[in-house]
Amino acid sequence: MKRVREENETLHLENARRSPPLASTHFLGFPCISLFYSQHKSTKKNIYLDLKTKKKELLPMVFALRAFKIFLKLFYQHILLNLSTLITTFSLFLLYIVVTPLMIGFSKDFLCHFHLGLIWICLLFSFLPERFFQNDFEDGTLELYYLSGYCLQKILLSKLYGHWVLQISGVFCSFPVLQLLYQFDQSKMNWFTIIIGSQIFTLMCGIHSCLALGITSNGWNSLQNLTTLPTLLPLIVFCTSIETEWFHVILLMGYLLLFLFFYPILVSITLQTLLAK
């Protein structure tokens, strides 16, 4: 009996050595532990694959948020560095709208009928003299933007819109004085057209500035007149007639979308050839 017991113990030890504990059907009184281990391993693998696919799906969103964060940083930095633009735009626009009635008279009939044309001409004169990106080009900031690997068009667009916010804030601050002189109703349509039209003016200035970056200051005025006149006339017609016809609102929005479409193309062509030199 003792010999039989020893033989059974040795056989049991040999079987335990040959097969791993998790692969046995009965181990420490728990049956089918290998099935539980395989199920746990498969669920862990599925969770890993799900996380991997979700990470791939979220990558474009992460890059978009990072680009938007850079856009806001440049936008905010441009506003902080150019707060003097708010004062200059406010003073220029206020000077134009005060001097014009002094020259043509304070007739209520004339000012009520032609106030939109006068406002848009004053707005144009306060927006157009700017030379965007000239200081950035001279001190090498544009080259750093170009070599950074980020989208140069978006960087310049953020700087343009930062400048637009400062300018349009100066214009809106002078509206109470404008109301006293011209005596017109401040309708929502006037605010809407000024916001859209001023964006078009800013995009026009940005395109002209990019085209004239390599030109000296002597040839800037002639180039500005040649490039702005063809794009200026339809915009002035739309903005002055927008009080009577709603169809011109759609044309004005289409004009804005047209400039938003052509802006990155023209900027990329001009700046890449200029900075490559």
Swiss-Prot record:
One of its GO terms (molecular function) is heme transmembrane transporter activity. The gene is CCMB. InterPro entries: Cyt_c_biogenesis_CcmB. One of its GO terms (biological process) is cytochrome complex assembly. Keywords: Cytochrome c-type biogenesis, Membrane, Mitochondrion, Transmembrane, Transmembrane helix, Transport. May be involved in the export of heme to the mitochondrion for the biogenesis of c-type cytochromes. Belongs to the CcmB/CycW/HelB family. It is a multi-pass membrane protein. It is found in: Mitochondrion membrane. The chain crosses the membrane at residues 61-81, 110-130, 164-184, 194-214, 227-247, 249-269. GO terms for cellular component: mitochondrial membrane. PANTHER family: CYTOCHROME C BIOGENESIS B-RELATED, HEME EXPORTER PROTEIN B. This is Putative cytochrome c biogenesis ccmB-like mitochondrial protein. It comes from Marchantia polymorpha. It comes from the Eukaryota. Its main location: mitochondrion. Signal peptide: none annotated.
